[in-house]
Amino acid sequence: MVTPSLTAQADDKQARLKHLIKRLPNLPGVYKMLGKNGDILYVGKAKSLKSRVNSYFAKTIDHPKTRALVSRIHDIETIITRSETEALLLEQNLIKEHRPPYNVLLRDDKSYLYVFISADQPYPRLAYGRGKAKHQKGKFFGPFPSAHAAKETLVLMQKMFQMRQCTNTFFRQRKRPCLEYQIKRCRAPCVGLVSAEEYAADVQNTIRFLKGDSSDIHTTLIEKMEHSAEALDFEKAAFYRDQLSMLREVQSRQAVYTVQGEADIISIASQAGMTCVNVLTVRGGRVLGGKNYFPDVDSNEPINDNLSAFITSFYFQVTDDLPAEIIISHELPDQMALQEALSTYFEAKTVIKTNVREHRAEWLDLAKLNAHNALKTKLGDYLELHARFAALKEVLEPVSQSSIDTIECFDISHTMGEATIASCVVFDQGGARKRDYRQYAIHGVQDGDDYAAMAQAITRRYKKHPLPDVLLIDGGKGQLSMAKNVLTELGLLNDTLLIGVAKGEGRKAGLEVLHFIEHEPLDLPMDSKALHLIMNIRDEAHRFAITAHRKKRDKRRSSSVLEAIPGLGEKRRRDLLNHFGGLQQLLGASQQELEGVNGIGKVMANTIYKVLHE
């Protein structure tokens, strides 16, 4: 039996795909690009299946991602739909179900943040989180484009209206006010220091403020302040005076329009092969903030096609909030179909607009300005990053002639062997790929054994994931030798360039030495762009590892002290921490206060107090 050559196999595949494309209909539908093993590589929709699928093979493809996709296609499946809108909805359902690797458009696809006011307790809770949790009853406000914007709003609400933020369990178990009351960020409804009527008024003011009705709040607070002063209740009058002062300060810093607009303003800019999209969020006439995205699109495609691809990905995969208006910088080829699909999917009406006036035109101008400025900055960063990758390729020429597109780096973090965490960060010529970062909690190795910890992390990662072009290990010859042995056992040693990054003389930054398996070490000068790239990636791996380690260590320590107390089970340990608000507050509690906790009697309170104060 004669095995056909790789060239013959490739020719056969191309002929088979061309024959398949010829038989495709000129009808709307969805197409699935399949890999060698039948795995779904990419899902797309089209007004004409034949024209769209043929475009992947009938023209010169410049975008590296599309070239890589086409090279891996072994089969194509199609589903005919009744309309372009139906095709778009089916496409998004298939993407969510199968998560094809080549459908990743946005590096940062985290859900937006929302401020939430609960509605299932007598004293509602103020909180924030990503996405609208379907199981929670209450009102959601947002979306906020950044964590900073959401947290800042939450802090302002606490200072002005002093709503509680604690969990329901914590709230129910309180016997005395917590620290939030002491710093005037909560009125302690848990222990009855505020009436239900007063708290309800604070809740309503918070809701009105988040909706943009701050003028009504201003009038109400003035009336309450004057009424309290006339009644000689100067403490309460001072409280309303402080609220007024904070409200005026906030109003002076916010861009507020007289209309009650609710819109997302989306502008796209493209230059030198890079694309930036700015999404400006307006709710209640207030600009809540904006966020820049750099989608992985082919900049040679028409800019309105790329904008359409971004909007589709953004609303179906990132946000779960559809505003009444979507104002965009360029008309879309499928604008009505997309508008109809979004309205169907969210079960809410929206209108996509391009020609706008007055305040809407101001919003659009602001989004355009942000997109262009962000693109200019990103291009500068990209050129520097590209220069660093090129410098690294040049430095490594004596070691390897392979291309360098992806780099991964591992680091280990622990405190004297406690709570060991391994991190893996991923970089390419576009920068950090944070969606591909991973943290590994290390188990079953001797405390402080960095070699065994690193071996476990590398094994766990590359049993499931392909190797990068360059694999950096934070450490010298010992760590490098260990990594070599692990990759040899996995049969993957020849699939990557393995480099150990060792601290130089005196462990000073900038004096790092690069170690290789079959090459002499390299000592790069401090001004080397290649060294700067390696240091940047290594430092990011260290940051990612130590952040996770500290979180795990602190959580373990807070419970380990209580675990040493005989007769104190997990439930009562949790009740104690919830009651006092944390370990530090628990350490400051008297024996009598310990006795006041549900399930803690006099004998147990005495035991706890003795153990904590020995």
Curated annotation (Swiss-Prot):
Which biological process, per GO, is one annotated for this protein?
nucleotide-excision repair
Domain GIY-YIG spans what residues? 26-104
Q: Which domain of life is it from?
A: Bacteria
Which CDD domains does this UniProt record tie to the protein?
GIY-YIG_UvrC_Cho
Give the main localization category: cytoplasm
Which GO MF terms are attached to this record? DNA binding; excinuclease ABC activity
Annotated keywords: Cytoplasm, DNA damage, DNA excision, DNA repair, Excision nuclease, SOS response
- Gene3D superfamilies per record: 5' to 3' exonuclease, C-terminal subdomain, GIY-YIG endonuclease, UVR domain, UvrC, RNAse H endonuclease domain
**Which PROSITE patterns does its entry note?**
GIY_YIG, UVR, UVRC
UniProt domain UVR: residue ranges = 215-250
Function noted in UniProt: The UvrABC repair system catalyzes the recognition and processing of DNA lesions. UvrC both incises the 5' and 3' sides of the lesion. The N-terminal half is responsible for the 3' incision and the C-terminal half is responsible for the 5' incision.
The subunit structure is: Interacts with UvrB in an incision complex.
Q: Which family does it belong to?
A: Belongs to the UvrC family.
The record's annotation in HAMAP family points to: UvrC
Q: What is this protein called?
A: UvrABC system protein C
Organism in which the protein naturally occurs: Psychrobacter sp. (strain PRwf-1)
Gene behind this protein:
uvrC
